[in-house]
């Protein structure tokens, strides 16, 4: 039997805002990793399994400064070294955010969920989310999984104001095919950059020899589209434990990997009519580790022939 666990308005401080080539919001892998860690604890304590996770963003504050064209991350100043010199540091992108997580749970739920909700809140606050510290969770609820549009909209209305992260990687697939018809030498990275870049085009006015700069909309059918890191792809064979030096765990097989990218869309929570449309899940195949939504049936993540070729 499937139920829905809702962690309402999780306040996170100093979360990681950089994800591969993108910045501004943590990668979806962070949220599925948070769900996986919580699932392992629930399996041991209650025999429950967490399968999918939906993300609703209520508020975020990126630690950056500058104009709308040039922005720099606001970095911490480390203490001086013992030689009274400036200490070395790695550039980091941090942000504060308030999010809600909707998690599908499989297993037998007790009739009285009070103790389970308290246990979930305690365990979730002990974890890191996207490398940030969980400061507070407004409320934890456990309820039956919505089965129709009316029940789903009732759940989502209680999460307003907020925006849901949807998987729209299928748009990248379609745009790449269109781009190749005009430019046969185009690669997947070119199609992805069309979604990531802010483009302007000059239109000349023949009457007075002036030009007007106009914004070029992103490919697709509208919506708040954003580049997204969706997982990892293997770039080497699987090595035996201990074969590669200086790995984090010398007792586990090792493989080199690179980030995989897709396209996401932020949609108002009031527009969601099916809860399964917003649940992200793991997808393992052929050395690929991707996060995807079942609703995006033509995801590029399913087709290994579509990949970035640097």
From Swiss-Prot:
The keyword ATP-binding does not apply. Pfam families: Cas_Csy2. CDD domains: Csy2_I-F. If the spacer DNA has a perfect match in the chromosome then toxicity results. Suppression of the toxic effects occurs via mutations in the CRISPR/Cas machinery, or via target deletion, which might contribute to genome plasticity. This CRISPR/Cas system can be used to remove genomic islands, and possibly other genomic regions. Keywords: Antiviral defense. GO terms for biological process: defense response to virus. CRISPR (clustered regularly interspaced short palindromic repeat) is an adaptive immune system that provides protection against mobile genetic elements (viruses, transposable elements and conjugative plasmids). CRISPR clusters contain sequences complementary to antecedent mobile elements and target invading nucleic acids. CRISPR clusters are transcribed and processed into CRISPR RNA (crRNA). Interacts directly with Cys1; part of the probable Csy ribonucleoprotein complex with cys1, cys2, csy3, cas6f and crRNA. This is CRISPR-associated protein Csy2. It comes from Pectobacterium atrosepticum (strain SCRI 1043 / ATCC BAA-672) (Erwinia carotovora subsp. atroseptica).
């Amino acid at each position: 039997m499937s139920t829905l666990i809702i962690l309402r308005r999780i306040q996170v401080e100093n979360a990681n805002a950089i994800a591969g080539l993108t910045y501004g919001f943590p990668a979806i892998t962070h949220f599925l990793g948070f769900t996986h860690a919580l699932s392992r604890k629930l399996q041991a304590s209650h025999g429950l399994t967490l399968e999918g996770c939906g993300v609703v963003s209520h508020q975020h504050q990126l630690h950056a400064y500058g104009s709308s064209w040039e922005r720099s991350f606001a970095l911490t100043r480390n203490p001086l070294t013992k030689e009274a010199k400036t200490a070395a540091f790695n550039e980091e992108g941090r942000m504060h955010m308030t999010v809600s997580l909707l998690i599908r749970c499989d297993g037998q739920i007790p009739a009285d969920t009070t103790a389970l909700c308290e246990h979930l809140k305690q365990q979730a606050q002990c974890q890191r989310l996207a490398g940030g510290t969980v400061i507070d969770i407004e409320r934890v609820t456990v309820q039956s999984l919505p089965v129709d549009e009316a029940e789903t909209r009732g759940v989502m209305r209680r999460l307003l104001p907020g925006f849901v992260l949807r998987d729209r990687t299928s748009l990248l697939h379609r745009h790449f095919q269109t781009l190749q018809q005009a430019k046969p030498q185009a690669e997947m990275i070119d199609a992805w950059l069309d979604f990531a870049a802010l483009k302007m085009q000059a239109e000349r006015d023949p009457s007075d020899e002036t030009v007007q700069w106009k914004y070029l909309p992103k490919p697709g059918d509208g919506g708040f589209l954003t580049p997204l890191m969706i997982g990892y792809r293997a770039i080497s064979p699987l090595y035996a434990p201990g074969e590669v030096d200086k790995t984090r765990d010398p007792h586990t097989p090792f493989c080199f990997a690179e980030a995989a990218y897709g396209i996401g869309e932020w949609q108002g929570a009031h527009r969601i009519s099916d809860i399964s449309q917003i649940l992200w899940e793991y997808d393992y195949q052929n050395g690929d580790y991707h996060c995807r939504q079942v609703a995006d049936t033509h995801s590029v993540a399913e087709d290994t022939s579509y990949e970035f070729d640097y």
